[in-house]
Swiss-Prot record:
Cellular localization per UniProt: Cytoplasm
Key words, A-Z: Cytoplasm, RNA-binding
Family annotation (Gene3D superfamilies): 2.40.280.10
Record-stated family: Belongs to the SmpB family.
Disulfide bonds: none
GO biological process terms, semicolon-separated: trans-translation
Record carries keyword RNA-binding: yes
Primary subcellular site in the record, as a coarse category: cytoplasm
Protein name (record): SsrA-binding protein
Cross-referenced HAMAP family: SmpB
């Protein structure tokens, strides 16, 4: 079940590979995510010391969050992947033009997971071409639907 999608990632990048990673969360964060108070649009993934971290994801704390915990909505969260996956991704990210972006948050067997994508940035003309393709598909569907009624 999807919790939050990053539609901006699909508009700004060509997604070449996808990986599922666990996230190290605090208790108040899990409660807030279950309540749907999460946004990953501004998030990105970095590699530090052979570990991966999700930066810029915003999890708004609930009003009922404990007073003895100081919630930080945009703290850096560690991503959990297998060592061989991390090594493979480090090699790819070091190549020119590749980056890691969070694509969505979802549940797998009751646990919150983050799908990350190995992505290459789109140029402005690529974005325009994608938009034209989407408009043409929509127009084609409209024409076919009109033909079916006649």
């Amino acid at each position: 079940m999807t919790i939050a999608d990053n539609k901006k990632a699909f508009f700004d990048y060509f997604i070449e590979e996808r990986y599922e990673a666990g996230i190290v969360l605090e208790g108040w964060e899990v409660k807030a995510i279950r309540a749907g108070r999460v946004q990953i649009k501004e998030g990105y993934v970095v590699v530090r010391d052979a570990e991966m971290f999700l930066i810029g994801a915003h999890i708004s704390p609930l009003q009922s969050a404990s007073t003895h915990v100081n919630p930080d909505p945009v703290r850096t969260r560690k991503l959990l992947l297998k060592a061989d996956e991390i090594k493979k991704l480090i090699g790819k990210v070091e190549q020119r033009g590749y980056t890691l972006v969070p694509l969505n948050l979802h549940y797998t067997r009751g646990r919150v997971k983050c799908e990350i994508g190995l992505a290459k940035g789109k140029k402005q003309f690529d974005k325009r071409e994608t938009e034209k393709q989407r408009d043409w598909q929509r127009e084609k569907a409209r024409i076919m639907k009109g033909d079916a009624k006649d």
